[in-house]
Regions:
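Helix-adjacent hinge/juxtasegments
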Residues: 119-124, 135-141
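Repeated loop/turn-to-beta-strand initiation elements of outer-membrane beta-barrel proteins
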Residues: 81-86, 140-142, 197-205
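Extracellular/periplasm-exposed beta-strand and loop segments of Gram-negative cell-envelope proteins
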Residues: 40-67, 94-127, 153-186, 214-239
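Transmembrane beta-strand segments of Gram-negative outer membrane beta-barrel proteins
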Residues: 24-39
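Outer-membrane beta-barrel "beta-signal"
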Residues: 30, 234-245
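Cleavable N-terminal export/targeting peptides
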Residues: 1-26
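Residues on the lipid-exposed face of transmembrane beta-strands in outer-membrane beta-barrel proteins
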Residues: 33-37, 70-76, 130-134, 148-152, ...
């Protein structure tokens, strides 16, 4: 989270310094800093335990977690010189860690107590996208637009498996946990819409929504007894962003 906040501050600072340079030449090139809330959705969560001949499969459903996001884009506006209401940009966008936790199994015994197995997924999604925008230009200072994007998503996946036991009186008697992490490099695509407000001929504010599909994340690991575990999830994000160009 601290890295994302720091990047957001640098992105906004870079916008104004680069904007001053670009305005003098009216080249059509622009720089945009973006920040906002990302609702990261972990859909169709799956967990598998492989204990030799015994295999157990669990479903965790869908889970949303709202995190902070920020990014920086460098683009070109074709309207400046070609009178075509299209923009194309390269954008990096980072998001904070989104958490999801669900229970795999619970058991009870009147003699020895009981136990519960839980798993947790923590995902961080960074994207590098090529975005194309179509601007619905008009005579006002407000310009609605729609967008599509294609690119690369790097998903950092941390998984925790926890086995908790309690005695017949209900007190926790033992907790064991496995922690593993890994990365997935995926194809990503997005669609979006928004509106831009021209504060001055050289400065614009932007409010937008984007749906991002970042592919699937899969993490496999073993414990000391060579028992196998696998956590899988489909990764999506709903980005609500404020931008300064």
């Amino acid at each position: 989270m601290k890295k994302v906040i720091a990047f957001s501050a640098l992105a906004m600072a870079g916008v104004f310094s680069a904007q001053a340079l670009a305005d003098r030449g009216k080249t059509g090139f622009y720089v945009t800093g973006k920040a906002g809330a990302s609702v990261v959705t972990q859909t169709d969560q799956r967990f598998r335990q492989d204990f030799g001949d015994d295999v157990y499969k669990y479903k965790g459903g869908d889970k949303n977690d709202t995190v902070f996001g920020a990014g920086l884009a460098v683009g070109y506006d074709f309207y400046q010189h070609y009178n075509v209401p299209v923009r194309t940009e390269v954008e990096f966008y980072g998001r904070g860690a989104a958490d999801s936790r669900y229970t795999l199994d619970t058991w009870h015994s009147p003699i020895v107590g009981g136990g519960r197995e839980d798993t947790q997924n923590r995902l961080s999604v960074n994207t590098l996208m090529v975005n194309t925008y179509y601007d619905f230009r008009n005579s006002s200072a407000f310009t609605p637009w729609v967008s599509v994007g294609l690119g690369y998503a790097r998903v950092h996946h941390k998984a925790t498996y926890t086995d908790t036991s309690w005695n017949e009186s209900g007190k926790v008697s033992d907790i064991s946990a496995l922690h593993y992490s890994g990365y997935d490099n995926n194809f990503a695509w997005s669609i979006g819409a928004g509106v831009r407000y021209d504060v001055t001929p050289d400065i614009a504010l932007d409010l937008s929504y984007r749906y991002l599909d970042a592919g699937k994340s899969s993490l496999s690991y073993k414990d000391a007894e060579e028992d196998k575990y696998k956590s899988e999830v489909d990764v999506k994000s709903h980005d609500i962003m404020f931008g300064v160009t």
